Amino acid sequence: MGIENLVQNDVVLTRLDALFNWGRKNSLWPMIFGTACCAIEFMSAVSSKHDLSRFGAEVMRFSPRQADLMIIAGTISFKQAPILKEIYDQMCEPKWVVSMGACACSGGFYDNYTTLQGIDQIIPVDVYISGCPPRPEAIIDAILAIQDKISNESIKDRHKDYKGLLDA
């Protein structure tokens, strides 16, 4: 007996969406991929003054298999790009990405042949944080934007390969 026999209309799915999204948005497990000064600025966002853990992003993960939010902070070179892509592929689904700082968003002032001009060329980015380096308040705003995005997601949209099973 599969879910297609249990679900006859979208009422159950909307309730499940609300439940899953509430749990996911309030228990983000971030992993920082820090390569430059933005990673140092991220430390102030998790300090006691700003306390990022108030927003559900308390437990920092250092393994991509345990993280669902990747925060890329700093310059990414073309040599690092395959490594970043591999780490992104190792993350569990659903996963979200925050591009933190001018270097991660657009290459910053490193406009040369070795620097990737924005990480969105290799992985999808959900939220961009501008600044060089961005303030801790901007990092908190990005976490709130990710939580807002999670609140509006649906199980049907998240698992496109199982769409036939979820539609009655």
Swiss-Prot record:
Binds 1 [4Fe-4S] cluster. It holds the Pfam family Oxidored_q6. Keywords: 4Fe-4S, Cell inner membrane, Cell membrane, Iron, Iron-sulfur, Membrane, Metal-binding, NAD, Quinone, Translocase, Transport, Ubiquinone. GO terms for cellular component: plasma membrane; respiratory chain complex I. One of its GO terms (biological process) is aerobic respiration. Gene3D superfamilies: 3.40.50.12280. [4Fe-4S] cluster binds at C37, C38, C103, C132. It is a peripheral membrane protein. Its EC number is 7.1.1.-. Its cofactor is [4Fe-4S] cluster. This is NADH-quinone oxidoreductase subunit B. It catalyses: a quinone + NADH + 5 H(+)(in) = a quinol + NAD(+) + 4 H(+)(out).
